[in-house]
Structures are given as structure tokens and as C-alpha cells.
Design a protein with these regions (language model features):
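A short, flexible beta-alpha/helix-coil linker loop
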Residues: 1-2, 89-90, 150-154
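Extended hydrophobic
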Residues: 99-172, 189
């Protein structure tokens, strides 16, 4: 199967987060990998009075964001190690991940579940998020679909409708991109080139 070019890949991703927003009425976003880490390229606002605004075009950290944890779980270590080490050096004392061993354990859990939920230690206070990987025709991670909500107002638990919808949306998009195992957490580590500037 021929590779979907970058423009088509992003176009399909944007359509996916729009449909997902309409389905669950939560903030949704699309993240890609850049030389400096994950970058949100676009987000969709839900139809509710209080929402979470998402900054686009800026790299987010790996250990305290949904997109960062998902990319870290499926990218090869050589692509993420330096960024993770730098973040570990400035982790607060109460952060759950203090060593590379802690990180590896967390990433193994994410690969096992195939999805990530982050709340208490999300980089923005009072906000929780979900992230799911999107795989390409080589069964390598290429994007991350993200759902963001306000703690106490959004149900983003591990058995929530939002999580199930996110998982289904990521798998459907993976199939569109030619993945033959979109629902397999063992999809091999990615060797994609970074997208300059996001």
C-alpha cells in the first residue's frame, strides 16, 4: 500500500478529531512529532460553556502530557531519551516518575493498554487528558489523537464513553492510513522522520 502523504495524513487526522468532538462533546486535538517533541497542530472546541483551550504549534513535554506519553511509548528510545532525561532532571519531588526505570514502567503499561489517561500530574492544573496512537501503513506511530477535559466536569476515566470513542477513532484512522494492526498494542516502534516545526 502506498504511503499516505503528509498533507493527506494531517487532513484525515483533522477530520477524525472533528468527528470525535461531535461524538463526545469534549475538546479534541491532533498531535504530530517534531524535532522538539509532540506538537498540537489543531484542536476542536466542544459545545459547552466552559472548555479547555489548547495551544497549537508549541512543543509539549513528554512525561506530563497525553501526546508526549503516547509518542514516548511507541517511538524508539533513541528518539526520546535526551528529552526524557532533561525532563527527569527538573521533575518536582512529588512527580510519579523520578528515574528512567519509572518511565519505562509507565510506558510499558501504556503499550499494554494501548491508550493513556493523565490527570493529577498533567502539565495544566485542573485538566485531564486521554491520548491514543495512530499507526501508518508500516504499523508505526504517526500521530496522536487527544481528548482534553476539566477535572470534575468531564468523564475521561478508563472505562468512559470518551475513552472508548477515542480508541475507536484512533483505530479507524489507523486503518485509513493503511495500518494492518490498528488495534494491536505491539505495533513496532516507529522510525518516522521528525516534522520540522511541527
Amino acid at each position: 500500500l502506498a504511503a499516505v502523504n503528509r498533507i493527506d495524513r494531517i487532513r484525515l487526522g483533522l477530520a477524525a478529531i472533528s468527528r470525535l468532538r461531535n461524538q463526545i462533546n469534549e475538546t479534541t486535538a491532533l498531535a504530530v512529532w517534531s524535532a522538539n517533541g509532540p506538537v498540537i497542530v489543531r484542536w476542536e472546541r466542544p459545545r459547552r460553556p466552559i472548555t479547555v483551550d489548547v495551544v497549537t504549534g508549541v512543543s509539549v513535554e513528554l512525561l506530563n502530557s497525553a501526546s508526549g506519553l503516547v509518542f514516548s511509548a511507541w517511538l524508539p528510545e533513541r528518539r526520546t531519551s535526551a528529552l526524557i532525561q532533561a525532563e527527569l532532571a527538573r521533575q518536582p519531588a512529588d512527580a510519579p516518575m523520578q528515574t528512567m526505570a519509572d518511565v519505562q514502567q509507565r510506558l510499558a503499561e501504556i503499550r499494554e493498554k494501548g491508550i493513556v489517561a493523565i490527570g493529577e500530574h498533567y502539565f495544566a492544573g485542573g485538566v485531564q487528558a486521554l491520548g491514543a496512537p495512530v499507526f501508518n501503513f508500516r504499523n508505526e506511530i504517526t500521530m496522536v489523537l487527544v481528548v482534553v477535559g476539566i477535572v470534575g466536569m468531564s468523564d475521561l476515566g478508563e472505562d468512559s464513553m470518551a475513552m472508548h470513542a477515542l480508541r475507536e477513532a484512533a483505530q479507524a484512522l489507523s486503518r485509513q492510513l493503511g495500518s494492518t494492526q490498528p488495534d494491536t498494542q505491539a505495533s513496532r516502534l516507529n522510525h518516522i522522520d521528525a516534522i520540522p516545526g511541527g
